[in-house]
Amino acid sequence: MLRLRPLAVAVLGLSAFPVSSLVHAETLLGAQTVTAKGYAADTLETPQAVEILQAPAAGGTVAGALLRGKPGLAAQSDGAWGQNPVLRGLKKESVVVMVDGVRMNSAQPQGAIASFLDLGLLERAEVVKGPGSVLYGSGAMGGVVNLITPDVGFSAEEAVGGRVGARFSSVDRGVAGAALLTRSSAHGALMLGVAGRDVDDYRSPDGREDRTGYQSDTLLAKYKHKLSEDLTLRVNLQRHEDEDVWYPGSARTGAGIPKPLGTATIHSPEQRRELYELGVDAKLGEGTLSAELYRQEVFRQIRAFSSAKQRDYVRNDVRFVTDGAKAKYLFPLGADHLLTVGADLWRMRGDPERYIDNNPPAFDNNLRNDPFDKGEIESAGVFVQDEFSLGDTRIVAGTRFDRVTGDAERKGMTQTTGLENADNNLSWSLGAIQPLSERLSAYANLGRAYRAADMRERFEDSARGDGYFHVGNPQLDPEVSTSLELGLKRGGVGLRYQLAAFYTRIDDYIAGRVTGAVHPQNGLPFKLTENLDKVTIYGIEGSASMPVGAFVADAGFTWLRGENHQDDEPLFQMPAPELTLGLGQAAERGFWWRAQLRAVAEQDRIATRFSNGTENPTAGFVTADAEFGWRFGKLGAFESAGLAVQLSNLADKRYHEHQTEGVSGNELAAPGRGVALSLNGSF
C-alpha cells in the first residue's frame, strides 16, 4: 500500500496554508459561491446564509474543525480525526457533505466522512445553511458542506506553477506537508497534488490523550482538455487514506459489553476514499450543459478493541460504493433571468463483513455476524431552478422530485422478506432578496427538504453503545423538514455583517423508541427504529466586521434551541450559545496578526429520556487564540511566500464541546495550549 510519509512531503512543503483567517476563515461577504445556486454567485445576492471558510494561516487538522466557532456551525467529535460538521443543530445523515460537488455516501457509526480529505489540498469549504434538497436531494435538511479542491484553468501560453509549504504543531507533535503542481496551455490543463499528515496523541491540560494520533495521505489529479471553444472534458481523481484512527469517544463498559472484555473502544486500522469522475462542459445554444459520471468508494475497517483481552473482539470490513451520474443545463431566458434544469442519479451499495468473538470466557470463536447483507439505496431525481428579478427584488425558486429505493438481501441474521421500500419526495424552495440600500439587503427563504433513511436505520439489527439493542426498519418514511429563514446582509467597505433568524420543523423524525421488551439472548432493552413525532429547531446567528483605525474588529454569535415533541424535552446534543470576538491587522505584505476570544455558554438543556441518560450538562468556557505571520513578496524561486504562527488555547483551559462523544462526565478533553508553525510559497 502507498504511504506518503508526511515528513518527506513537508520537506517539499505544504500547499500554501491559506492566508490569515482575518481575511478568509471568517465569512466572506461579497465572495463567490458555487454551491448555493449550483453556479457561481455572489453571496450578497444569495437568499440564504452562506459561509466561505478556508484553513487558518498556520493550517489545521481536519475539515470539520473549520466550522467550530462560526455562526450556526459546530462540530461533533468522537476523537481527533472524527469531527462531524453540525449545521444549525443537524449532523451526519441530515447534512450533505461533498467533495468538489460529489456527495460522500457512507454509513457513519463513528468518525466523520468530512475528514476524508487533507486540508493541505483544500481550496475552500462552502457551507450553505438551511434546506438544500432542491439541488442536492436526500439529507440536505441542515444544509450542505462542499469541500472544494483547487481548480485548474487554461492559459494562452504554456505555463507551469504550483505551491508548497510545511506545518509543524506542538500540541500533537504533528508534521504535515503537501504540494501542488500545475501545467497549463491553451488546450490542456493538469494539476497534481499530494498531502501527508502524521500526528501523535495530542496534549490536553490533563496530559497526553491516548489514541488521538493518526496518519493520513491524499493524492489528487485533475485534468481538463479543450476539444473546441464550446466543449471541454474534465477528469478528477482522488485518493485519501488514513491509518490507526481511534475514536476515544466510543469507549464503553457494560451496555451489552461482557464484563470480561473490560472497556470496548472502536477504531479503524485502515480506511480510504477513492473518487473517479469524468465530466463535460458544453455550450449548447444560449446555455451551458455540465454533466458528470462518477464512482466514489469509501472503505472502512471498524474494530472493537477489548481492554481486558488487549485485542479486537469485533472485526468489521465494509465498502460503500456509490455510482452516479448528474447533469444540469443552465440557460438565460432574458437579460436578468437564469433557468437551471437537471437530473441526478446515484446508487450506493454496502455489504459489511463482520466477525465477532462472543464465546465467554475465551472470546475467540470468530463467528460471522453480518449486520445486513448486500444493502442498496438508489436515488433518482429531477429538478428545476429559476432565478429572476421583479423590480429590485431578486427571486430564486426551485422544485425537485426524487424517488429513493432501498433493499437488501438480508436484515439482521434472519429476515429476508419485506426489505424493499420506495418513497417519492417533493422538495421546493422560494427565496427573495431585496436591496434596502446600496450596501444593505434583506432576504427571506422558505423551503422543504427531506432525508431518506440510511442503511443502518433500515437494515441493521445490533447492540450499540447507548445500552440498547437497535432494530432496523426497512419501511421507514423519509424525514421531511420545512424551514423559514429571514436575514440581513451588508457588504462593501466599513461595517459588514450578516444576520439570520431561522425556524425548522422536521416531521416523521427517525429515532429509536423504547418498547420495554428485552432481547432474549443478551438481555438488552430493545429500541425500535421508527418515525416519531416532530422536532423543531429555531435560532438566530450572525457575524460582523469593521475597521477600527488601523485594525479590523470582528464578531460572530450563535443561539439556537431544539425541541423533541415526542418526548417533550430538548433535542439531543444541541450546540450551546456562543460568542466570538476578534481583533487584528491585515497586510498584503509584511506583518499581520489576529487575536480571538471564544465564549461558549453552559449547555444544561439536555435530552434525558431520548438519550437514556447518556447526555449530561456541559460547563461553559472561554478560550483565547492568536495567529500572526509575515507575507513576503517574490522570494528566490517563489513568486510569493509566507510564514505563519498559530497559538491555540493560550490559557491552557480544560474544556470539551457539548457535542463531544463519551461517557457522561468523562468526555475527551479538548487540546491544550499549542503552537503551530507553517511555511508556504507559490511559484
Which residue stretches match the model-derived regions?
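Short strand-turn segments of transmembrane beta-barrel domains in outer membranes
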Residues: 144, 149-183, 212
